[in-house]
């Protein structure tokens, strides 16, 4: 175990080192930000537990936080989870690869090898590691006391190899930030770069609010043949394409200051390739261009496709976190880097929207990394994709096609019917997890009426069918024919019910339910999920209550039917208002009129 201090150490640092019986030597390491070599005093200790003592007593120290086991593995260029052979006293990797598969890999990534050698080297290494067979070793020999299915063991080995973590950690640690830290630290140690302290990585900036993604308000209405294009792994792609890393954002080179980041005061280095950009870019390419296509390759067996899909999902988990960790995780956060990532994300969507309009396409809605296009010509979509690749260096692809797409006024809420009739619903009130099954079922029945719609005539017929579905549902409700369990809301409690009870204020419905459950002898705590039915108002404990726990409702006569009718119409209106569906032909009222 060891750590570094400045060279030469101060008299106080020397005293601390002597008390710890540390041995010192002079080493040279590269500074991540200046790329200059600096002399440091390396302090080696006999006992790893003394690292904690050193971290408390020495203010200016580096790499004291790196776990001893990982530090040893990094220094000896070892990788967890891959096969080794013992050659004398030296461990040698025993990685083998099928020549045919290796040739396919090299052909697929030849362009990256020519243009970005450092990224290719990481890509090739991870490809080699991930291609190794999973050894048939009893898990208890590896310190794992559990029976796991093969896919979990496979993913554990993959994560162990990619993030260079011990297999037990890879199988149990769900903190993606830990994985990313290990990936970054191993790379920096191999490049002989001093791993910065958390404050240095932040550039001594304090955490601040980072502007988020861009959303274009939807053009409300119903559309046929809506094509949705999206950026494949937008933030990882931005990090890769624009060389975004801790040391490249706001670098010290005067010649780089003209390379401004849109809508910010930041600039990006044009002299050096960034470490974070290399690593995230390589992981992104490995997922998108290798494992993702393998998961869809019909020439492979079902098992091979399933494992490729699992690998793709694992890498995606790392990639979707690559922005978030730069915002809030100590040792990975840097406000300027996080701000630059989202700025380029907004820039990409804004430029693509403008380009689509210039090409004569009709963009309807844009959110973060997706663009909805109204009945576009195939050749124009292809031109948009090619131009985005050329101008923005980002990959745009067709994600899905809706035969019918309904865009309400609310952002991040829409539904569409796929070409095969499958409904896809996003953000609609009716399908929130807490909504009762009755409302969810009615909503999905309405959506299914649109499954075969391809033109306006079929759409008008479907609207009439939807009206009948809702009318029939309301009739069943009023006749008491809806089972009580279908009327139950399920809500998680975020506060202690006993504390809410002593507050002199109206009690929200979930806590009304919780109080009644506790009074009946059922234990309810913060985090509990309660199930309740809206009933006709009654007095309970001197307060007006409007719900009862599902198990305490005696019959359907207690149900507040009008409340459910109102909630049903409110939930459906979010989606159906743009469709102008009326429920009363004589009055020509729309769903919105009932709210």
Language model regions located:
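DnaQ-like (DEDDh/DEDDy) 3′-5′ exonuclease domain used for proofreading
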Residues: 1-125, 146-212, 220-221, 239-245, ...
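Helix N-cap/beta->alpha junction signal
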Residues: 46-49, 130, 377
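Residues immediately flanking
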Residues: 106-108, 131-132, 229-231, 375
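Short, basic/polar, glycine-containing "phosphate-handling" surface segments that engage DNA
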Residues: 132-141
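A short acidic, often aromatic-flanked loop/helix-cap motif at beta-alpha or helix-coil junctions
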Residues: 134, 145, 402-406
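DNA-dependent DNA polymerase catalytic subunits
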Residues: 139, 159-251, 257, 299-307, ...
């Amino acid at each position: 175990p060891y750590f570094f201090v400045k060279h030469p150490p101060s008299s106080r640092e020397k005293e601390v080192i002597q008390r710890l019986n540390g041995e010192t030597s002079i080493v040279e390491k590269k500074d991540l930000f200046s790329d200059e070599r600096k002399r440091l005093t390396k302090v080696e200790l006999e006992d790893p537990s003394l690292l904690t003592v050193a971290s408390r007593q020495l203010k200016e120290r580096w790499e004291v936080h790196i776990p001893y086991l990982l530090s040893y593995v990094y220094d000896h260029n070892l990788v967890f989870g891959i096969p080794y052979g013992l050659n004398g006293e030296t461990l040698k990797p025993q990685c083998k690869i099928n020549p045919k598969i290796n040739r396919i890999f090299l052909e697929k990534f030849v362009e990256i090898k020519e243009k970005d050698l450092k990224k290719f080297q990481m890509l090739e290494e991870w490809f080699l590691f991930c291609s190794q067979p999973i050894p048939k070793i009893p898990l208890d020999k590896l310190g794992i006391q559990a029976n796991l299915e093969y896919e979990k063991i496979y993913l554990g080995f993959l994560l162990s190899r990619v993030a260079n973590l011990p297999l037990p950690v890879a199988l149990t640690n769900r903190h993606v930030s830990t994985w990313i830290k290990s990936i970054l630290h191993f790379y920096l140690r191999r490049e002989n770069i001093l791993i910065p302290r958390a404050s240095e990585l932040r550039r001594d900036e304090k955490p601040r609010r980072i502007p988020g993604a861009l959303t274009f308000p939807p053009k409300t209405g119903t559309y046929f043949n809506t094509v949705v294009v999206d950026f494949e792994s937008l933030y990882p792609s931005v990090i890769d394409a624009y060389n975004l890393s801790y040391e490249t954002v706001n670098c010290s080179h005067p010649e780089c200051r003209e390379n401004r980041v849109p809508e910010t005061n930041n600039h990006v280095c044009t002299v050096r390739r960034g470490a974070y950009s290399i690593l995230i870019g390589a992981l992104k390419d490995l997922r998108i261009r290798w494992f993702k296509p393998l998961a869809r390759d019909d020439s492979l067996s079902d098992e091979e496709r399933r494992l490729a899909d699992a690998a793709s999902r694992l890498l995606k988990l790392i990639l979707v976190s690559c922005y978030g960790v730069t915002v809030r995780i100590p040792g990975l956060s840097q406000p300027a880097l996080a701000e630059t990532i989202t700025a380029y994300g907004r820039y990409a969507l804004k430029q693509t929207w403008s380009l689509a309009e210039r090409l004569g396409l009709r963009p309807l809605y844009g959110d973060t990394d997706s663009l909805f296009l109204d009945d576009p010509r195939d050749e124009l979509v292809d031109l948009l994709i090619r131009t985005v690749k050329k101008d923005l260096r980002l990959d745009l692809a067709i994600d899905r096609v809706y035969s019918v797409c309904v865009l309400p006024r609310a952002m991040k809420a829409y539904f569409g019917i796929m070409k095969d009739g499958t409904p896809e619903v996003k953000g609609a009130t009716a399908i929130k997890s807490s909504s009762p099954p009755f409302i969810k079922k009615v909503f999905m029945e309405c959506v299914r009426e649109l499954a075969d719609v391809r033109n306006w005539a079929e759409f008008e017929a479907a609207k009439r069918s939807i009206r009948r579905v809702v009318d029939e549902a309301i009739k069943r409700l009023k006749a008491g024919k809806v089972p009580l369990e279908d009327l139950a809301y399920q809500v998680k409690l975020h506060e202690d019910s006993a504390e809410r009870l002593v507050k002199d204020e109206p009690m929200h419905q979930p806590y009304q339910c919780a109080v009644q459950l506790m009074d009946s002898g059922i234990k309810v705590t913060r985090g509990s999920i309660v199930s309740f039915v809206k009933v006709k108002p009654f007095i309970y404990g001197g307060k007006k209550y409007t719900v009862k726990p599902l198990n305490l409702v005696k019959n359907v006569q207690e149900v507040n039917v009008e409340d459910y009718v109102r909630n049903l119409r409110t939930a459906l209106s979010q989606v159906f208002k743009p469709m102008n569906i009326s429920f009363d032909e004589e009055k020509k009222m729309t769903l919105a009129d009932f709210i």
